[in-house]
């Protein structure tokens, strides 16, 4: 009886708080039940309007794969701030920088290399998830350890970035060593959206690059394509391991409503026994659940 009175009092005094709490609990339950039926390890993190947080199976290490190109982009922004240079700075790319057996639209378009600005290289990494462009940026800034150190300076700790794309290409198991919890990656996105990290034009460029991302349209974005929202995201896609499982299929981003409300959403899928299409559908269905929860009046 006392509990009922307390709940009634909370509802009278803080109706929005109670409704939000009920909504988040229902969302957690629905996601948890859904992922328990999948032939994969699935982790989810949601941050609503920069404060309320929902996590499901967050206490695991999920391979980041190319999601770490977002972390890298922030480290590039910090590097430019410290060295007082702009994203228009040109780098010379040699043909030896363009590995042949990896995903690289940059190599396909300029097989002999050339001069490319930092902005152009980040368009390749963030729009198209180009692996060679990623390693060229690592070479420029000082390697994965520099990115790892910068992200930790933001107060994010439950992750590790140790290896380049070429490292992971040579040994698929190294993909597991670049890892994060879903919440840690959500915190990185929140830092981009809410904090002043470096020069505003550079920070806005990275945000816009997420909005115009061209990969993973069957994931977080899929159920939102006809909705009145702005979506920015970065995907990550792994190969199959020795057991035939997809090492990781990921998507991490934010959804902005016209009324100013937003949520950050990170969905990591590890060691999936499903097909690529069915694994991407897991992400899309969770994205739909989250959108519906936040669309309720």
Label each residue range with its predicted role.
Residues 1-25:
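Bacterial Sec-dependent N-terminal signal peptides
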Residues 41, 114, 135-197:
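Mid-domain, small-residue-enriched loop/turn segments at the edges of structured enzyme/sensor domains
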Residues 21-63, 239:
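Beta-lactamase-like hydrolase cores
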Residues 43-47, 55, 71, 92, ...:
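Soluble periplasmic/extracytoplasmic beta-strand elements of cell-envelope proteins
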Residues 63-91, 265:
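Active-site SXXK
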Residues 23-33, 37, 139-140, 144-145, ...:
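Structured C-terminal helix/loop/strand segments within mature extracytoplasmic catalytic/sensor domains
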Residues 78-98, 144, 199-203:
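Short, well-structured active-site flanking segments
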Residues 98-135:
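Conserved catalytic neighborhood of penicillin-recognizing serine enzymes
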């Amino acid at each position: 009886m006392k509990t009922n009175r307390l709940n009634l009092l909370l509802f009278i005094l803080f109706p929005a708080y109670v409704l939000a709490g009920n909504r988040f609990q229902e969302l957690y339950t629905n996601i948890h039940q859904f992922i328990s039926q999948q032939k994969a390890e699935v982790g989810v993190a949601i941050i609503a309007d920069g404060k309320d947080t929902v996590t499901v199976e967050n206490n695991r290490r999920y391979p980041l794969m190319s999601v770490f190109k977002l972390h890298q982009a922030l480290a590039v922004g910090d590097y430019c701030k410290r060295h007082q240079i702009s994203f228009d700075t040109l780098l010379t790319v040699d043909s030896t920088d363009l590995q042949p057996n990896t995903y690289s639209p940059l190599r396909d378009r300029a097989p002999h290399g050339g001069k490319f600005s930092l902005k152009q290289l980040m368009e390749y990494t963030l729009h198209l998830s180009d692996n060679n462009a990623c390693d060229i940026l690592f070479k420029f800034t000082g390697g994965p350890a520099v990115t790892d150190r910068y992200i930790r300076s933001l107060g994010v700790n439950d992750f590790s970035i140790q290896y380049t794309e070429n490292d992971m290409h040579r040994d698929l198991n190294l993909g597991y060593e670049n890892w994060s919890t879903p919440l840690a990656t959500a915190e990185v996105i929140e830092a981009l959206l809410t904090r002043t990290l470096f020069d505003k034009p550079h920070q806005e460029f990275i945000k816009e690059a997420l909005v115009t991302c061209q990969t993973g349209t069957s994931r977080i974005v899929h159920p939102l394509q006809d909705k009145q929202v702005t979506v920015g995201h970065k995907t990550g896609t792994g190969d199959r391991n020795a057991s035939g499982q997809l090492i990781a299929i990921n998507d991490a981003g934010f959804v902005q409503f016209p009324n100013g409300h937003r949520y950050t959403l990170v969905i990591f899928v590890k060691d999936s026994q499903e097909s690529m299409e069915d694994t991407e559908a897991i992400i899309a269905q969770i994205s739909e659940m989250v959108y519906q929860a936040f669309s309720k009046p």
